[in-house]
Structure formats: C-alpha cells, structure tokens
Amino acid sequence: MAEVVVFHSVLGLRPGVLGAAERLRAAGHTVHTPDLFDGEVFDTIDDGMSKEESLGSREIARRTEEAVAGLPAGLVFAGFSMGLVYAEWLTASRPGALGAVLMHGAVPVEGLTEYFGVECWPEGVPVQVHYAADDPWVEAEQEVVPLGDAVRGAGAEFEAYVYPGSGHLFADPDFFEYDRASSETMWERVVAFLDRIDAR
C-alpha cells in the first residue's frame, strides 16, 4: 500500500476531502488528511482565500511541515488547489517522497524556487496532474507544461489529465462545480497511480 498525505483547498477540510480519503483507504492505501485551517470550512472560494491570506503562505507551509513531521519518508503527497502547492513543495523537498498527485492545477519548478527555494525536481519522482480544460485558475502552458518538462527531465513519469468544462473544484461533491463523471474518472486514475507506486 502507498501512504498518502492529502492537503485540502482553501475551502478547508470539508466532507469531500474526507470522503476522498476514505475512497483511497478502501483501495488499500493509508491516508492522512491534515487540517491546515483550525477546523474552519468555507462555502465559497473568496471566503477560503480570505482565510488563506490571513494565515499567510509561510504559516501554512509551517503547518504542512508540522503535519508530516512524524510520518515516514516514503510518502505520496496530494493536494486540492491551494493544497497542491504544498503537496508539490513537500514532494520536491522532503527526502524519500515517492510521488505527487496535483488536483486542479500545478506549479512550475520556478515557482517552487521563488517561494520555497526548491531548485530542481527530484530524480525519479512521478507526478500526476488533473484539471478542467477551461479552468480560469489554471494556466496550463505556464504551469503544467513546464512542470512536466522538469519531471520528465528528472527521469520520472508525468501524467496530465484534462477534463471537460471550467469547474475548478470539480471533484468536491458538496461544491457547485462538482462534475460526477470527471470526478469518478479522476479517482480511478489516482488509485491506479498509487497502485503503480506501491508496486515499485
């Protein structure tokens, strides 16, 4: 089994995140879901972003590090939207990380360099990305494509899956952007990715 840490979006640790964790557990994996927002959850992205801004990226980064401090080295990091930033950072910077699942976007390595001091993608660490084709929050050519180049350049597998529509958080069953068909397909792909990592 793979051991996975899932970081929530700016909406907080909502039932959709916990349900996703249960789905991965049912597939045989160990899953951790840190709460970075002190139990607060939000119904709109604007309200969630206000919480994110009130904490600041340094504090959120500190909380993510604290959340994984007692966990073993061989982790897969996953994240929804805001959470993918920290999942990607920890995958690139924490020794022994086995992979990243980035839902609803990606950050180019240059962005990790600017904010976290990460200079390159670790050798052999695979990445899977999921986002909607017309998501206004995702700039694929500036974010997803260069990350893919960096991951492949480090000798690792890079998968980017594009889904129909413009919903940013299309995998959250309690959010208005939910797309059941896309969500189900995404989770099938995530489970397959984790199974491949587990089989290595």
What spans do the regions from the language model cover?
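A conserved short beta-strand
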Residues: 96-108, 126
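Short beta-strand immediately N-terminal to the catalytic nucleophile in serine-hydrolase-like folds
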Residues: 77-79, 103
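Serine-hydrolase catalytic machinery in alpha/beta-hydrolase-like enzymes
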Residues: 1-74, 171
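Short beta-strand/loop motif that positions the catalytic acidic residue
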Residues: 123, 129-131
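Gly/Ala-rich beta-loop-alpha elbow adjacent to hydrolase catalytic centers
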Residues: 79-83, 87
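Conserved alpha/beta-hydrolase "acid-adjacent" motif
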Residues: 136-143
